[in-house]
Amino acid sequence: MVETVHPKNDRLVWIDLEMTGLELDRHVIVEVAALITDADLNIIGEGVDLVVHATPEQLAEMDDFVTTMHTSSGLLEEIKASTVSLQEAEDAVLALIAQHCDPEHPAPLAGNSIATDRSFIRAQMPRLDKALHYRMVDVSSLKELSRRWAPRVYFNQPDKGMAHRALADIVESIRELDYYRRAWLISDPTTEDAEDAKANATASYQQFLQ
């Protein structure tokens, strides 16, 4: 008997942040975007795209590179004009998750090179951190593996823009994962093939696990 999985159990929560820098002790989140996808990477709902206000003192912590980046993208002026607090942005993402995901089965966080984003979420949006599964889907892992195992896939990946805005970065990450799925992760092996692969992998590394 095939078990039917409720669609909300298969959701991915895509989040991207823009910050004033990468150091947790002195930098802050200034833009939050979130989208939900189903198991086939279809985007569900409208998502969240919010610029968070930062004080002049917080903005003064940006180095020249980040200042130039956020100025070129138009984000810096939006930060100054924003009246949205980080708590309000966190509330909006939590509401999105509550609407589209199963609270009994927290969805993984997904994105590109998301370790830093998760660190900022954990430190500055702890309620959101608790609403996410501890597992993460990092598209950059497939990028690194394709470079080593499937160079044609690696060199033909979709071009990425340089907008440095949170929502655009999320959409590009979803598109990139969809590309890897279509170009590389396309086979659905038979049970026999999967069992053979398991046996071969087990045999190859058994000596290191004794």
Swiss-Prot record:
The keyword Nuclease applies. It comes from the Bacteria. Keywords: Cytoplasm, Exonuclease, Hydrolase, Nuclease. CDD domains: Orn (cd06135). It is an enzyme of class 3 (hydrolase). The active site is at Y134. Transmembrane segments: none annotated. Residues 12-177 form the Exonuclease domain. The keyword Nuclease applies. InterPro entries: Exonuclease_RNaseT/DNA_pol3, Oligoribonuclease, RNaseH-like_sf, RNaseH_sf. One of its GO terms (molecular function) is nucleic acid binding. It is found in: Cytoplasm. Its EC number is 3.1.15.-. Pfam families: RNase_T. Belongs to the oligoribonuclease family. 3'-to-5' exoribonuclease specific for small oligoribonucleotides. PANTHER family: OLIGORIBONUCLEASE, MITOCHONDRIAL. This is Oligoribonuclease. It comes from Corynebacterium diphtheriae (strain ATCC 700971 / NCTC 13129 / Biotype gravis). The gene is orn.
